[in-house]
A protein has these predicted regions:
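Short C-terminal tail/terminal secondary-structure segment
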Residues: 176, 187-247
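Alpha-helical segment proximal to the catalytic Tyr-Lys
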Residues: 76, 119-120, 184
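Catalytic loop of short-chain dehydrogenase/reductase
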Residues: 87-110, 114-123, 136, 197
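A short, exposed helix-loop element centered on a Lys and neighboring polar residues
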Residues: 71-72, 115
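C-terminal substrate-recognition "lid" of short-chain dehydrogenase/reductases
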Residues: 68, 164-193, 198
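Short, small/polar-rich loop/turn modules that mediate ligand/substrate recognition or access, typified
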Residues: 37, 122, 127, 186-188
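Substrate-binding pocket helix/loop in short-chain dehydrogenase/reductase
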Residues: 47-48, 52-60, 152, 156
Length: 247
């Protein structure tokens, strides 16, 4: 039904030794390591003044340290001699990340780490890039509560020129491109997949978008509860607009 085969390895990506062992196991089992996607991460909403030292450290280790460990081991154990492609995950952190300052600090580090590695490891035929998702519909949104879930998440689409949020498939497509030979001369790039949200300005009000359609290639994808009402109405309006255009 889903196609392909997957091999699972349990690993705490914040633990250096576990990461070393995981990369070694992958190479032993498959005989090579062509590509690495650092897609593990996480954070929690909090004002800066309320973040404890442990909380800040946990988010930075989960997003930045783990990325470094995996990049380094993939390079040292395989890619230094054979080449390869690495894709890291950041976020739209260029304008700051109010309410998630710990995550913004870590993601900014990932962006710079990507650029540094692309220069240092280019001699080995290793391309290193990064994807910076904007506001993406995912099950993780249901992990938030309070005002963040009630007011902030439902308001996000209104701040995107395409007037919608992205899908997980649209992020995966960007990752697949950067991993592929089609991007053989692309390295040191952080690709923003955000519907141009990062280019907006309050001086220019956004008009309604009538022809913005998403790509969703995951048959198991589902709408998080916090967005079901909003997305249901948007899909209905989109269908009505398409029917009107046909007429």
């Amino acid at each position: 039904e889903d196609g392909g085969k997957v091999h699972f390895i349990v690993c705490d990506n914040r633990d250096e030794e576990q990461v070393k062992n995981m990369i070694a196991e992958v190479i032993e089992k498959f005989g090579k390591l062509d590509g690495l996607v650092n897609n593990a991460g996480g954070q929690f909403p909090s004002a800066l003044e309320s973040i404890s030292a442990n909380g800040f450290d946990a988010v930075v280790r989960n997003n930045l340290h783990s990325t470094f460990y995996l990049m380094r081991e993939a390079y040292n154990q395989w890619m230094a001699k054979h080449g390869g492609s690495i894709v890291n995950m950041a976020a739209d952190m260029w304008g700051g990340m109010p309410g998630m300052g710990h995550s913004g600090a870590a993601r900014s580090g990932v962006d710079n780490l990507t650029k540094t590695a692309s220069v240092e490891w280019g001699r080995s035929g290793v391309r290193v890039n990064c994807v910076a998702p904007g506001w993406i519909i995912s099950s993780g949104m249901d992990n938030y509560s309070g005002d963040f879930a009630k007011f902030i998440i439902p308001s996000l689409a209104g701040n995107v020129p395409l007037k919608r949020m992205g899908t997980e498939s649209e992020i995966s497509s960007a990752i697949c491109y950067l991993l592929s030979d089609a991007a053989a001369f692309v390295s040191g790039v952080t690709l923003r997949v955000d519907g141009a949200a990062s280019q907006g300005t309050r001086m220019y009000p956004l008009a309604d978008a009538s022809n913005s359609h998403s790509f969703n290639g995951f048959h198991r994808a589902f709408i998080p509860d916090v967005l079901k009402d909003q997305i249901g109405k948007a899909e209905q309006q989109s269908a009505q607009a398409q029917d009107a255009n046909k007429d």
